[in-house]
């Protein structure tokens, strides 16, 4: 049922089944954050961050708001379903295609979640803010980096990594970076949200492993 790449729900099922067979642990390749706007840079040994997660491992179908009409309209579109079947059927992971599919759904899902919870004083908003506070500057840096790389990519500019960013964007503490983050606040929040949901799903897999 995954979207062409193993996800955290797959992991939860695996550890449960493995535990029943007497396994004591499951080994994983690194699952660090990579480069969502440069999906072919997919080596787990060359991450953009060793603290944050690769949110392509999120099980989109397990997220809140997935069943909303807006998200369902995206994922049930004929073209989307055709590409999804392609992603599932190829011999090796097509990282670019998987990224396109997941980002299309996640963008729609975040809009729904943002309007339902993050614009108001809700339990979900408080939990999200607590995650952001716990992540501190490191999370802000990661989310801002992802948003900046995406922005440059959309502008048709070279964006494979920070060495080719505009010079005043290469240091997180530069005023230009702060201005970008403020101007694109919702987009930065989007990438923070993905880290939050990835962490939540990984913890569920961890709890499944403990229970197994």
Task: Please provide the spans of the model-predicted regions.
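Acidic/aromatic-lined carbohydrate-recognition and catalytic surfaces
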Residues: 1-212
């Amino acid at each position: 049922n995954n979207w062409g790449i193993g996800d955290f729900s797959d992991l939860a099922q695996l550890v449960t089944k493995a535990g029943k067979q007497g396994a004591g642990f499951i080994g994983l390749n690194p699952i660090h954050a990579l480069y969502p706007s440069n999906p072919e840079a997919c080596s787990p040994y060359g991450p953009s961050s060793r603290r944050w997660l690769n949110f392509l491992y999120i099980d989109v179908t397990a997220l809140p708001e997935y069943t909303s009409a807006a998200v369902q309209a995206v994922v049930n579109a004929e073209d989307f379903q055709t590409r999804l079947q392609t992603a599932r059927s190829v011999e090796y992971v097509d990282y670019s295609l998987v990224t396109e599919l997941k980002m299309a759904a996640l963008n729609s899902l975040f809009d729904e979640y943002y309007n339902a919870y993050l614009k108001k004083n809700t339990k979900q908003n408080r939990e999200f803010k607590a995650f952001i506070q716990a992540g501190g500057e490191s999370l802000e840096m990661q989310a801002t980096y992802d948003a900046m790389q995406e922005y440059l990519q959309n502008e048709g500019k070279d964006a494979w990594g920070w060495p080719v960013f505009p010079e005043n964007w290469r240091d997180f503490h530069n005023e230009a970076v702060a201005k970008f983050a403020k101007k694109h606040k919702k987009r930065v929040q989007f990438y923070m949200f993905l880290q939050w949901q990835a962490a939540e799903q990984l913890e569920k897999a961890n709890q499944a492993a403990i229970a197994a």
